[in-house]
């Protein structure tokens, strides 16, 4: 396994600048935020793509994931909070189609930068769109997306999160089975699993063949706030032993969007804390 860092901590930097900072610290991979102010809209023919490719080559970085979990760029004013609209489960067909088009663009971008996978979320159940209705909208959206992903040979990982339509590993596994695509899986955030007190060995065993990327951060007292590894309560020795047991071979991507005030420090502390786990052959 290899260690990556997400550019969503570097929202005061351009995407090429963020990749450079991550590369200079010694990470093997980088996750690209497909939202403002980075890869949005995620058009693979955009002028910035060549700059990104040059930075990846310069620092020998792979792309661990194209992160399409949020799409605040669709809205003219930032609220300062993550947004999941337009979502794939929205009651309005036109809104869903916006997100479907965006997701297909993520897939095209992944091809261009040699990423194996993208990540998305289910979205929330808004007023007038209860879960039993929203899930059908989500399934139909995913069927169209997965047809496109299969033709482009890109994996699609759904990231579940407390408060979303799909908010735990059991629900995600059921959704994967219903949609029926071999390229649909998980962008598994182990911090989220800690927040909702999931049994980690059971979770990893359930999803192991469908985990395309792992998000990692520390969590304190099961509160959903991403912390630098070592700053919370997660037992990383135990956690990495669980990951080792399923023979996971993908990226561990540190996700610390909560540190946009000092992303370089967050990335530096993270790699210093986590590197011994890799050097000691735990992973």
Would you name each region that the model predicts?
Residues 64-76:
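Short, solvent-exposed beta-strand-terminating loops
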Residues 17, 58, 73-185:
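Active-site acidic/histidine proton-transfer and metal-coordination neighborhood
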């Amino acid at each position: 396994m290899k260690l990556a860092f997400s550019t969503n901590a570097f929202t005061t930097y351009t995407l090429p600048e963020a990749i450079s900072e991550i590369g200079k610290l010694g990470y093997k991979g980088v996750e690209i935020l497909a939202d403002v102010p980075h890869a949005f809209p995620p058009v693979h023919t955009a002028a910035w793509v060549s700059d990104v490719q040059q930075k990846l080559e310069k620092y020998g970085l792979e792309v661990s994931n194209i992160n399409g979990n949020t799409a605040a760029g669709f809205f003219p004013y930032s609220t300062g909070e993550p947004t999941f609209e337009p979502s794939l489960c929205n009651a309005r067909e036109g809104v869903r189609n916006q997100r479907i088009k965006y997701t297909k663009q993520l897939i095209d971008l992944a091809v261009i930068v040699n990423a194996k996978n993208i990540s998305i979320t289910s979205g929330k159940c808004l007023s007038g769109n209860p879960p039993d209705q929203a899930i059908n909208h989500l399934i139909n959206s995913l069927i169209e997306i997965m047809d496109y992903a299969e033709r482009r040979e890109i994996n699609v990982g759904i990231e579940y999160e407390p408060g979303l339509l799909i908010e735990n590993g059991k629900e995600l596994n059921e959704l994967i089975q219903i949609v029926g695509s071999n390229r649909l899986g998980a962008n598994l955030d182990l911090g989220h699993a800690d927040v909702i007190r999931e049994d980690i060995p059971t979770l990893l065993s359930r999803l192991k063949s469908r985990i395309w990327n792992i998000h990692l951060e520390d969590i304190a007292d099961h509160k959903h706030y991403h912390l630098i590894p070592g700053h919370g309560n997660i037992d990383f020795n135990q956690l990495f032993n669980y990951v080792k047991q399923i023979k996971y071979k993908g990226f561990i991507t540190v996700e610390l969007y909560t540190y946009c005030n000092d992303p370089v420090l967050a990335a530096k502390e993270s790699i210093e804390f986590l590197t011994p786990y890799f050097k000691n052959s735990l992973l």
